[in-house]
Structures are given as structure tokens and as C-alpha cells.
Amino acid sequence: MSDQQNTQQDDQPFFNIQRVYLKDMSLEQPNSPAIFLESEAPSVEVQVNVGASQLQEGIFEVVVTGTVTTKVQDKVAFLVEAHQAGIFDIRNVPVEQLDPLLGIACPTILYPYLRGNIADVITRAGFQAIHLSEINFQALYEQRLQAAMEEAQGAEGGNSGIVMPDGSQARH
């Protein structure tokens, strides 16, 4: 192979999953065993968050955090929090494409693992399985972008002027 072909291959965008792992998981059952005697249907609250950090040049860790809280009336039946992580090798990707890759593609890869781990620990704890629904990470990413833009615009407009000792603002 010629040097020119090697250079062209070295410049090609590269994406590889190095490792997928369960970074952390906790289960709390503060009202067991009495909660097992309750006959009322539980309410379920699910929260999902995504975070990413650069470990070294071209190597990123993405973490999808899922929290499931189930209550019967005002009593917590259980609370599960899991951090499903992955290490991704991402090189030669344009800067404007890196953030969507970390915020959409990587979480989409990790989420099925998170769902499985949460479902497993819930059933092993003695509760009925809760199957987390699919998530559109692109829509979630776009919502976060919109919220960040609105917050930035609000900060620009709301912080102009001088803040007086009584908390009011003097505009100039």
C-alpha cells in the first residue's frame, strides 16, 4: 500500500465500541417486607440522563443513568439507580458531529443494557418486572440543546445592568 493510501485511511472517520460495562447500581427497599403485603397498584417514575467525558485523545466514556422509583401510596416500594457506561474510540469526526454522536448514537447503544440490568435487579428483588420503554435519544438531545439555548438567552438578557444591594437591577 502506498503512503497516500495509508494517509487517506488514517483520516477516515472511526467509531468503535471498546467496552460496555455496568459502572454502578443500587437498590433500596426501605419498606420491605411490609410493602409486599400492599394490594394497591404502584406508581412508577422513571428518569434517564446522559453524560459524556473525554478520557484521552479520541477516547470517550458515555454514561446513561436510569432511576426507577416505585411507590405504593406515599411509601417507596423500591428505588433503583443504574449507571450503564461505555468506552468509545472516536477519531477523525468533525467537531460539529462529535456532540450528537456522544449524545445520541452512544446512548442508543448503551440503553438496552441499562434496561436489562434494571429489569433484572427489580425481579431479583421480588417485584414484578418493569419494562422500560424505548427512548428517542435524538429527541432528548434536541430538547437539551433547546433548553441550553433558552437558558443562555435568558442569562444574557436577565443579567445586563447593575445589581443593587436590595436585589433590584439598575439598567443603563
From Swiss-Prot:
Gene3D superfamilies with a match to the protein in the record: SecB-like
Any one GO biological process: protein folding
Cellular compartment(s): Cytoplasm
GO cellular component terms listed in the entry, alphabetical order: cytoplasm
GO molecular function: unfolded protein binding
Main localization of the protein described in the UniProt heading: cytoplasm
InterPro entries referenced in this protein's UniProt entry, alphabetically: SecB, SecB-like_sf
Keywords tagged on the record: Chaperone, Cytoplasm, Protein transport, Translocation, Transport
Positions of region (Disordered): 152-172
Function summary: One of the proteins required for the normal export of preproteins out of the cell cytoplasm. It is a molecular chaperone that binds to a subset of precursor proteins, maintaining them in a translocation-competent state. It also specifically binds to its receptor SecA.
HAMAP family found in the cross-reference section: SecB
PANTHER family per the UniProt record, alphabetical: PROTEIN-EXPORT PROTEIN SECB (PTHR36918:SF1), PTHR36918
Assembly behavior: Homotetramer, a dimer of dimers. One homotetramer interacts with 1 SecA dimer.
Family: Belongs to the SecB family.
Protein name per the record: Protein-export protein SecB
Organism this protein belongs to: Cupriavidus taiwanensis (strain DSM 17343 / BCRC 17206 / CCUG 44338 / CIP 107171 / LMG 19424 / R1) (Ralstonia taiwanensis (strain LMG 19424))
Lineage, top ranks: Bacteria, Pseudomonadati, Pseudomonadota, Betaproteobacteria, Burkholderiales
